[in-house]
Amino acid sequence: MPKHGKKYLDAAKKVDSNKLYSVAEAMKLVKETSYANFDATIDVAYNLSVDPKQADQQIRGSIVLPNGTGKTQTVVVFAEGPQAEQAKAAGADFVGSDDLVEKIQGGWLDFDVVVATPMMMAKVGRLGRVLGPKGLMPNPKTGTVTMDIEKAVKNVKAGQVEYRVDRQAAIHTPIGKVSFTEDQLVENFDALRDVILRARPASAKGQYIKSVAVSATFGPGIKLDPLNLD
């Protein structure tokens, strides 16, 4: 068992580890138990009864949270011509082609999201070993490979988050900051819950959502009732 510091232990005392909290209770408690000296991120973790090894049970997508994430995302766009101009007009931080490929190959990674047109994916593909492990590779399922560059950039800037089931059949996604109101966190949680419920594979067996927990960057996990997420 890892050793926890005094701040964590003090925060953990406020959480009943045997209780499954309602969404409203959890959002109140996650704010109260954050002990960071900065505006910490609040994450939600879902554990699902899916088999990620099965192609038809891989869950992945993106959603623009109603209240954003509280974080300003730095967006890189691979595009040329009219799409490059769209990207700049929509607020992309860096727009280019071969020049960006070379820059990233040289070790530059000061960005959060990569968007590309389909025509540019042959070039972006050369960065697979760099972008892939960091979860930065553009993908049509998350709306980051598209001809509608303007919409993609605006969505990211408005607070779009990606959700993806990992090898342990879990989804980890940020839903806001400690500075958010409880209502804002509940609204963001509800929006993410709805898309995850809609994404249930037809072949998934048993209770789809096995467990749910929320936590701040520095704070204990708070378990929710997976059968009562309203």
Swiss-Prot record:
GO terms for molecular function: rRNA binding; structural constituent of ribosome; tRNA binding. Pfam families: Ribosomal_L1. One of its GO terms (cellular component) is large ribosomal subunit. The keyword Magnesium does not apply. InterPro entries: Ribosom_uL1_bac-type, Ribosomal_uL1, Ribosomal_uL1-like, Ribosomal_uL1/biogenesis, Ribosomal_uL1_3-a/b-sand, Ribosomal_uL1_CS. The keyword tRNA-binding applies. Keywords: Repressor, Ribonucleoprotein, Ribosomal protein, RNA-binding, rRNA-binding, Translation regulation, tRNA-binding. One of its GO terms (biological process) is regulation of translation. NCBIfam families: rplA_bact. Belongs to the universal ribosomal protein uL1 family. PANTHER family: 54S RIBOSOMAL PROTEIN L1, MITOCHONDRIAL, LARGE RIBOSOMAL SUBUNIT PROTEIN UL1M. Binds directly to 23S rRNA. The L1 stalk is quite mobile in the ribosome, and is involved in E site tRNA release. Protein L1 is also a translational repressor protein, it controls the translation of the L11 operon by binding to its mRNA. Part of the 50S ribosomal subunit. This is Large ribosomal subunit protein uL1. The lineage of its organism: Bacteria, Bacillati, Bacillota, Bacilli, Lactobacillales. The gene is rplA.
